[in-house]
UniProtKB/Swiss-Prot annotation:
UniProt keyword Disulfide bond present: no
Name of the molecule in the record: GATA transcription factor 6
PROSITE patterns linked: GATA_ZN_FINGER_1 (PS00344), GATA_ZN_FINGER_2 (PS50114)
Pfam families: GATA (PF00320)
Span list, region Disordered: 1-33, 56-77, 136-186
Gene Ontology molecular functions: DNA-binding transcription factor activity; sequence-specific DNA binding; zinc ion binding
Record flagged with keyword Phosphoprotein: no
Span of zinc fingers (GATA-type): 217-271
Family: Belongs to the type IV zinc-finger family. Class A subfamily.
Amino acid sequence: MESVELTLKNSNMKDKTLTGGAQNGDDFSVDDLLDFSKEEEDDDVLVEDEAELKVQRKRGVSDENTLHRSNDFSTADFHTSGLSVPMDDIAELEWLSNFVDDSSFTPYSAPTNKPVWLTGNRRHLVQPVKEETCFKSQHPAVKTRPKRARTGVRVWSHGSQSLTDSSSSSTTSSSSSPRPSSPLWLASGQFLDEPMTKTQKKKKVWKNAGQTQTQTQTQTRQCGHCGVQKTPQWRAGPLGAKTLCNACGVRYKSGRLLPEYRPACSPTFSSELHSNHHSKVIEMRRKKETSDGAEETGLNQPVQTVQVVSSF
């Protein structure tokens, strides 16, 4: 209500000023301009109005706070009224709480010795806890059975004399040397001699086979007809497989291999007696046959005996 009254007063003052101005406009004079008393009164009225407005605002804020507080108290009263508990139960709960507090209370004594990690003295190292494995080995350790030493000399049927000599020397040295009585030595040292000899024999057999192969490869193979040692392919001849060179083998297969034929690369080639052309070989054979026939005819002619006539 007070705020409404203030607004009405302000509106009245504005109306008065407007009407006064209109009237003074009619009766306008210099004296009215120089009269400042009315303006001072108007300023005082405005200051008073502003102070009243500030006071009313403060009162409105305080009223709102009181309303909020009253609402909070009313809600709290409502909740407490909804959770009403009889006095006997409250007394029993208090008795139980006091009993529990008395029974659980134990005087706490402060520790006199500080731990190592607080004092900084780390000379004494913490030993780690050894954790035992929960899974134990199911297979127990098995002891090796001791075996009797073999005194006899083992001779291989396909071995050489040097191997038997080495095995006999090894057995004599082992018999002369003192043997420990541990079964592990018997199982590991004594019975490993035989596999070693086997491996040595295998190595020697492989070496012998390799030597024979290299010997056969290094042997100088030559043609049985012309004596050639290098040829792209070895062929079969009258002496067996791979006994003739490629050229001689081809002519032997076709039936044209003659003694007068020699390839040009043959070490026994001579231009007077041999040729690598079949036609020339035939001519040479004809000439030879004619010369041989002439010689035979000359030898077969009868020798004329000269009869010496005695003169009288």
